Amino acid sequence: MANAKGKVTQIIGAVVDVQFDGELPAILNALTTDNNGKKLVLEVAQHLGENSVRTIAMDATEGLVRGQEVTDTGAPISIPVGNATLGRILNVVGEPVDEGEPIVAKETRAIHQPAPEFNDQSTESEVLVTGIKVIDLLAPYAKGGKIGLFGGAGVGKTVLIMELINNIAKVHSGYSVFAGVGERTREGNDLYHEMIESNVIKPDNLEESQVALVYGQMNEPPGARARVALTGLTLAEQFRDQSGTDVLFFVDNIFRFTQAGSEVSALLGRIPSAVGYQPTLATDMGAMQERITSTKNGSITSIQAVYVPADDLTDPAPATTFAHLDATTVLNRAISELGIYPAVDPLDSSSRLMDPQIVGEEHYKVASDVQQILQRYKSLQDIIAILGMDELSEEDKLTVARARKIQRFLSQPFDVAKVFTGSDGVQVSLEDTIASFKAVVAGEYDHLPEGAFYMVGGIDEVIAKAEKMAADAA
């Protein structure tokens, strides 16, 4: 019942109990109250006995007092959608947090929506070229697919997401939505300013911008972090349905969505499941991931960073996410320790598109050969560590030499990492990537030194670097 009035009876951190005299508001309804002049939104999570509901606050509850009046809005949290949100930073309830004008949108949408019906979904498979060699060659991304970047702390997930925004969103003519879920505020601020510098956001003419940002950062209460991914997704769905184009949806970090859900679950008094996660982990993840899909109107290509606690891919949070993805890019600390960036594990990363009928026979064969050489090198590493290179057969020595070149050739300088590397970023076309690796596997460049393959683009750059190294040594 809209506009029904209730009053606060109990406040435990982010959980607020509200008592109503008559009919109770529905589960997931938004309630509003005034907290020292600021509007506070509460979302109904449980119906208790005695005419009470238990709600989750979308902002800090400091200053809230018992007996305070609360109003039922009669609907779930609704946010402004459409072109009015372009170039703006929104919070979980759709309010601008970029110190700009209030957002005046023609349409608002509830953040809780059903997933599209099966007969509305599209099943086409097309490769999305990123310009990053290791991804395009070994675990290609699907247009309108779901992509996960898995990695522990500090192996480069956010840098890789930024580079993908740089490579895809800047040349991509459609719209992008970036949801910052429980990550560092500094990174959110940096991203906003980088987008202004690269003209993706046009502060003088916001309607011409190509991206909308939705932030619920580390300092926010768990209610906001558990819902902000849905806020971003609702914006992306509206752009997909309205424009009928490919919308890019970036989420950094999907693990924080699960983590916030676990905090909320504990506050609601649910009995925890494996490793302390919420018992509804698979349901929460499924409800969100099933909405990220391509329909006959348009598509959403989502790229999600997934933090891996303690580098353990079997942890329930990353393991539940794996099931929903079309392509997984696994970042490995051992590779980043070698100084190879992006630290993508070529043997652990996978893609459903790696099929000769989709990527073509040549691409499939080159990728298989590259992985075979790297796998052989991995199995020889114990022998090398104990007995040394001299004990290997001539054939194995050649395999190791090629594998080390391939390993270094899979590194690449990024535009967004220019401040760290001091060199300009490069993008490599898919044709160039396939031809270059085919030649390396065939042994055409066995005479070039290993160092020439490190942090370059295509094979022409390798040859130029090798000549420069030879000239410097002479």
From Swiss-Prot:
Taxonomic superkingdom: Bacteria
Keyword ATP-binding: yes
Catalytic activity: ATP + H2O + 4 H(+)(in) = ADP + phosphate + 5 H(+)(out)
GO molecular function, one term: ATP binding
EC assignment: 7.1.2.2
Principal subcellular localization: membrane
Disulfide bonds: none
Binding residue positions for ATP: 151-158
InterPro entries tied to this protein: AAA+_ATPase, ATP-synt_VA_C, ATP_synth_F1_bsu, ATPase_a/bsu_AS, ATPase_alpha/beta_chains, ATPase_F1/V1/A1_a/bsu_N, ATPase_F1/V1/A1_a/bsu_N_sf, ATPase_F1/V1/A1_a/bsu_nucl-bd
Membrane among keywords: yes
Membrane topology: Peripheral membrane protein
Assigned keywords, A-Z: ATP synthesis, ATP-binding, Cell inner membrane, Cell membrane, CF(1), Hydrogen ion transport, Ion transport, Membrane, Nucleotide-binding, Translocase, Transport
Pfam family, one: ATP-synt_ab_N
Compartments where found: Cell inner membrane
Gene Ontology cellular component list: plasma membrane; proton-transporting ATP synthase complex
NCBIfam families given in the database record: atpD
Homology family: Belongs to the ATPase alpha/beta chains family.
Assembly, per entry: F-type ATPases have 2 components, CF(1) - the catalytic core - and CF(0) - the membrane proton channel. CF(1) has five subunits: alpha(3), beta(3), gamma(1), delta(1), epsilon(1). CF(0) has three main subunits: a(1), b(2) and c(9-12). The alpha and beta chains form an alternating ring which encloses part of the gamma chain. CF(1) is attached to CF(0) by a central stalk formed by the gamma and epsilon chains, while a peripheral stalk is formed by the delta and b chains.
Protein task: Produces ATP from ADP in the presence of a proton gradient across the membrane. The catalytic sites are hosted primarily by the beta subunits.
Protein name: ATP synthase subunit beta
Lineage of the organism: Bacteria, Pseudomonadati, Pseudomonadota, Alphaproteobacteria, Rhodobacterales
Gene assigned in the entry: atpD
